Amino acid sequence: MELTQNNLQARGLIFNHETLGLQYVKLINGHATVNGGAIYNEGVSTDKSAGYVSAQNVIFQNNTASQGAVIYSELPRFHLYQTILRDNKATGSDQSILLYSAIAFNDDSTSGNASSRLYGLKNSTIFNNTGYITNVRDGMIINNITMIRNNAGFYLQAPKGDAYVSNSIISENGSKNCVFADGDKTQFINNLTKTSDCGSGNSTDPNIEIGSNTLLAGELEGKCNAAPAEGLLCPYYLPEKQFLGFFKPRLLMSYQTLSDSLIVNRGRVLSDGTNITSLSSCESVDQRGKTRSTKELCDIGAIELVIDADSISPVGQDILYGETAKFSIADQLADGELLPASECESLLGKREDGKAWQAGCLQIVQTNTPSKGTLTLDQEGNVTYVPNGNWHGSDEFKLRVMTTITRFSDSIGNRYIDIPGKIVQDPPNDFESKKVKTGGGSFGYGMLIALLGLVGLRRFKK
């Protein structure tokens, strides 16, 4: 469902005073002249009369307001999970904020609100917005988000120290990723950011300094520069048949081990090594719904890199005699990128046939047919298949490739993923359609109906 508006009014798309649950919704082009561009959430009591907003798999885009361009909430009673915030604008002149809480929880309820994990922002992607993202108050948890390339970062005002920002990527958000109100005691745990902006964080799980590392392998959106290009994240990308896009983490060719990554395996499922109920533990699944391991260190940010064989779909093409098949395997690499051909010899030695390695250290494994063509693969995952003549039938095989993720496997056999492939070749279709003439002369529609009537009689006659 998509909610949108273009006309000006005091409040935006939704005015809420109850419990509002949103799933698989786009809230776009909301506008309020003052507060609440997309949602105005009313209620200053913590009892059942106060409004509460829960949003999962929701896109907030192009919403504007002086304050609370996405949500204006009288209390911080909102929970955004697996959600996209992009291109929204808080237009106020002083401390304008996208997710704005007018007042804090009272002292008696604050700690309970934090431990309930019901309020805050998790497993979400936030980019290209204008204004502070949220004013972080006591009782809120910000966890496993990717927040980059916004006009401003967080405005932090949690004097009791019962607010948490953890396991997140917070980078290149205006002049400062974090601005602290007087007396703020927000706890920062295990975030990738500029520590000069957001502090060193918790002594046990401190923040990670991003330093001079290139953030994106390409532009803000679109194509990801192929390995060995630098860039901690791929640009924002919306896969086919998906609702939410994301910035995918990358394992760079300069990494010798997984521990060299600033993102992968840097979050903690068990923050202190023992207590899974810790407020700083990773979310159990990522923004896409993919499970984060409960036995190993997880990835910080909204996306967990997962080698999921079940997510690999068959590739291929149907062609006619004289044609060449062209298709891509870029979306079938199980979160990885093809290993550059220049790296293959050092890992595997020379090819047995003496030919040069292709991208991904490609191996073609025939399945149900002998080889009937020649296949080439470039670094970006584009495949060109040239058949050996005009044969009629199929060529079935597996493309066995090594990726920037699988190269870290201890076993050579586990360093490959298999992508099923099939080329079907047919002769040109020279059949010409023959049309029955039903007009002109005495044999027309009337006679045709009469014949159909006889057919009916024969069918039911006994």
Per-segment meaning from a language model:
Residues 1-23, 31-46, 73:
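Extracellular beta-strand-rich solenoid/capping regions of secreted or surface-exposed proteins
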Residues 298, 303, 405-434:
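C-terminal edge beta-strand
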Residues 307-315:
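Proline-enriched interdomain boundary motifs that mark the N-terminal boundary
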Residues 253-297:
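Active-site and glycan-interaction determinants of carbohydrate-active enzymes
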Residues 391-406:
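A short beta-strand micro-motif common to beta-rich folds, especially ectodomain repeats
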Residues 7, 21-24, 41, 57-61, ...:
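Predominantly extracellular beta-rich ligand-binding scaffolds that present long acidic/polar faces
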Residues 332-381:
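Surface-exposed or secretory-pathway low-complexity segments enriched in glycine-proline
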Residues 444-461:
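A cross-kingdom C-terminal cell-surface attachment/processing module
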